[in-house]
A protein has these predicted regions:
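Conserved helicase motor core of SF1/SF2 NTP-dependent helicases
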Residues: 1-306
Length: 306
């Protein structure tokens, strides 16, 4: 069983999956890959063109790019098989079609029950990226009333003036620090720097600026919270997440996204990771006029506003 399988490149798995015993037979009878191809893949230094595959024998088995995981390749192959079966229904008997479709679908499945996010926190990602299929387990923090708790909020910032680094935003750093204080005061003795609060932002310069703003508050516990990029946050969770977009110019919107497409639906894997780290509350700050140029971000802001 391989967990986080979408973070592992194919060559890193071949050694174990292709292992032979002393008798020369396959040592691995069956393997199960668990992962989420709608979140960030493994980090690869080469660009898509450099890692592309051109060998016909490899292309024939769905191996199109070395930056893709075995999980992604097998999933694509399975879904493509299902589509071929459905499109060729006129050429096969109902029994043949039913059996083939069943066999193809049985090759993969989706774990739909999630125990991390409160349903209101999960709402956008669930609708936009998972077709509304995510179901809360019903843990205490997922069923508690929202009457006195703000689950999802957006705090508008202003872009930095020309001449300032594009990778910092002072107004967002101040908003983040102010929110951090309020969250700390709300939790008091229950505040746990490794569990209560995390801050996500795309640039190292903005990370440093946010840390500086927080240090000026003179609250030791806040100095120990994790402030990092979305890539470093994948796989972790906090009760409350603050996301500073730090977009000062339109061209930065492209850097913020990691796009893929499935069944005609555009999926931003980077945004998906950022929005699914919070258990109880998710706070976002950014320049709304710029963010609304991206259709997904615009939909997110519209949901929050409603």
């Amino acid at each position: 069983i391989v967990d986080e399988a979408t973070q592992i490149l194919e060559p890193q798995l071949l050694g174990i999956l292709c292992a032979r015993g002393e008798d020369g037979k396959d040592a691995i009878d069956k393997f199960v890959l668990i992962g989420d191809h709608k979140q960030l893949p493994a980090v690869v230094q080469q660009n898509t063109e450099q890692s592309a595959i051109y060998d016909e024998s490899l292309l024939s088995i769905g191996l199109t790019n070395l930056k893709d995981s075995l999980f992604e390749r097998l999933y694509r192959n399975c879904t493509a098989t299902v589509q071929r079966i459905l499109s060729s229904s006129e050429q096969s008997s109902p029994l043949e079609q039913s059996y083939s479709s069943f066999a193809a679908h049985r090759s993969y499945d989706m774990l739909c029950r999630q125990g991390r996010m409160h349903p209101e926190v999960a709402l956008f990602a669930n609708r936009a990226f998972y077709g509304g299929r995510l179901i809360p387990v019903g843990l205490p923090h997922q069923i508690e009333s929202s009457d006195t708790i703000c689950r999802l909020a957006f705090y508008p910032s202003v872009p930095e003036k020309a001449g300032t680094s594009a990778k910092i935003n002072y107004s967002e750093a101040r908003i983040v620090a102010d929110l951090a204080v309020r969250i700390y005061e709300d939790h008091q003795a229950d505040f746990d720097e490794s569990r209560t609060l995390g801050i996500i932002t795309p640039y190292r310069s903005q990370i440093a600026l946010i840390k500086k703003e927080i240090e000026s508050l003179g609250i030791p516990a806040l100095n120990r919270i994790l402030v990092d990029t979305v890539e470093r946050f994948q796989g972790s969770e906090r009760d409350v997440i603050i996301y500073s977009f730090c977009v000062n110019y339109p061209y930065q919107l492209k850097f913020l996204s990691n796009l893929t497409e499935e069944e005609g639906v555009l999926i931003d894997r980077k945004l998906n990771v950022a929005l699914t780290r919070a258990r109880k509350q998710m706070f976002i700050t950014g320049v709304s006029e710029l963010l609304e140029r991206n259709p997904l971000y615009k939909s997110l802001l519209k949901l929050i506003e409603s």
